[in-house]
Curated annotation (Swiss-Prot):
Its cofactor is Mg(2+). Residues 25-202 form the EngB-type G domain. The keyword Cytoplasm does not apply. InterPro entries: G_ENGB_dom (IPR030393), GTP-bd (IPR006073), GTP-bd_ribosome_bio_YsxC (IPR019987), P-loop_NTPase (IPR027417). The keyword Chaperone does not apply. The gene is engB. This is Probable GTP-binding protein EngB. It comes from Albidiferax ferrireducens (strain ATCC BAA-621 / DSM 15236 / T118) (Rhodoferax ferrireducens). GO terms for biological process: division septum assembly. Necessary for normal cell division and for the maintenance of normal septation. GTP binds at residues 33-40, 60-64, 82-85, 152-155, 181-183. Belongs to the TRAFAC class TrmE-Era-EngA-EngB-Septin-like GTPase superfamily. EngB GTPase family.
Length: 207
């Protein structure tokens, strides 16, 4: 059920600032993470659409929030928000600061935001920017906002390294969910899909 629902995802809109986003009354789940953490690959794998997270990333849109609608029979029942990867080395400092402010504003004030999915490459662990993001959202998490850390590219680690990375991240995530994920090995896909389904459909219970 969860994967079938995820496959309905389609591009909705893109916006450079929070106030350009449409006000929505369906649950919104935000995907965040540093550049090259595997965010686009994860979204495309979960939705079984090879180009979904790339389709709206035309030149000039790389610093936009991209929304994707989900729902069967054409009825939107949830939205994914793909936030730009942070930590671009090539982006001027003033642009980085501006974008961090936009992200922080979104994460703190977006009313229909129900969950955050943080992509993290377990070979590098949490970066300084990841930790800043966790601090920003902590008050909302304490109020009930769902939170998931996806350890992408898990196939790059041995089984022992995976177990260690999972244990460390569970401590750092402070009560959030943590899952190992590999698009290449199809690891963790069903697990993450089920969590997202449940968070978007709290009244329906388990998938």
């Amino acid at each position: 059920m969860a994967l079938g629902w995820l496959h309905t995802a389609k591009f909705l809109t893109t916006a450079p600032q929070l106030h350009f986003l449409p006000a929505l009354d369906v649950p919104e789940i935000a995907f965040v993470g540093r550049s090259n953490a595997g965010k686009s690959t994860c979204i495309n794998t979960l939705t079984q659409q090879k180009q979904l997270a790339f389709a709206s990333k035309k030149p000039g849109r790389t610093q936009h929030i991209n929304l994707f609608s989900l729902g069967k029979q054409g009825v939107t029942d949830a939205v994914f928000a793909d936030l730009p990867g942070y930590g671009y080395a090539a982006v001027p400092k003033q642009d980085k600061i501006r974008w961090q402010q936009v992200m922080a504003n979104y994460l703190v004030t977006r009313e229909n935001l129900k969950a955050i999915v943080l992509m993290c490459d377990p070979r590098h662990g949490l970066t300084e920017l990841d930790e800043i993001l966790l601090d920003i959202v902590r008050p909302r998490v304490e109020e009930g906002l769902k939170f998931l850390v996806v350890l992408t590219k898990a196939d790059k680690l041995t089984r022992t390294e995976q177990t260690k990375a999972l244990s460390i991240m569970k401590l750092q995530a402070g009560g959030g969910e943590v899952r190992l994920f590999s698009a290449t090995k199809r690891q963790g896909i069903d697990d993450v899909a089920t969590l997202l389904w449940q968070w978007a459909h709290p009244a329906d219970g388990a998938a």
